[in-house]
Amino acid sequence: MTGIPSIVPYALPTNRDLPVNLAQWSIDPERAVLLVHDMQRYFLRPLPDALRDEVVSNAARIRQWAADNGVPVAYTAQPGSMSEEQRGLLKDFWGPGMKASPADREVVGALTPKPGDWLLTKWRYSAFFNSDLLERMRANGRDQLILCGVYAHVGVLISTVDAYSNDIQPFLVADAIADFSKEHHWMAIEYAASRCAMVITTDEVVL
């Protein structure tokens, strides 16, 4: 069956749960960009209420930290009502996807983009695909990417790998992302910590 599956509640990882990071990078607000990944109503709707609320709250804390520290904020969002050509192979795994209506497309209220934020149309798993994210980062002298959003083992992880592949240091915020299950979530953060990123918590970003 295509589409987002039914999601059962699970606890987000805490600092005590995180996998061991091979890299030893530190976030520098002068070098970083925050990526708010696919935090649209359509994608958040399947999440259990408590899980959704916690992820949105943590992402909003990071969003505020970015504003307070001069860190550019980038948003990915699918356009909705994609044509067959635009949808491509996505439809074989995820069906037709969201409609172009605000009920599907809007970023949730606590994370509403602000003037000056970078708004990127999302076409495939990676935030870098067919967007100017890399060019914007290079033009602004930024070589670190902090990632929050959904879904951890799909677009979030692929965007993390793509950042790494372009020599951008990714920081994956383990309690500001969500997934289809605890197992998918842990798979994503374990892969990231051992292969391409620093896995951290919201408190480590904002404190």
Swiss-Prot record:
UniProt key word Lipid metabolism: no
Domain of life, source organism: Bacteria
Disulfide bonds listed in the record: none
Recorded catalytic activity of this chain's protein: isochorismate + H2O = (2S,3S)-2,3-dihydroxy-2,3-dihydrobenzoate + pyruvate
GO BP: phenazine biosynthetic process
EC number of the protein: 3.3.2.1
PANTHER family: ENTEROBACTIN SYNTHASE COMPONENT B (PTHR43540:SF3), PEROXYUREIDOACRYLATE/UREIDOACRYLATE AMIDOHYDROLASE-RELATED (PTHR43540)
Biological role stated in the UniProt entry: Involved in the biosynthesis of the antibiotic phenazine, a nitrogen-containing heterocyclic molecule having important roles in virulence, competition and biological control. This isochorismatase may remove pyruvate from chorismate during the formation of the phenazine ring structure and/or stabilize the phenazine biosynthetic complex.
Record-given protein name: Probable isochorismatase
Organism: Pseudomonas chlororaphis
Name of encoding gene: phzA
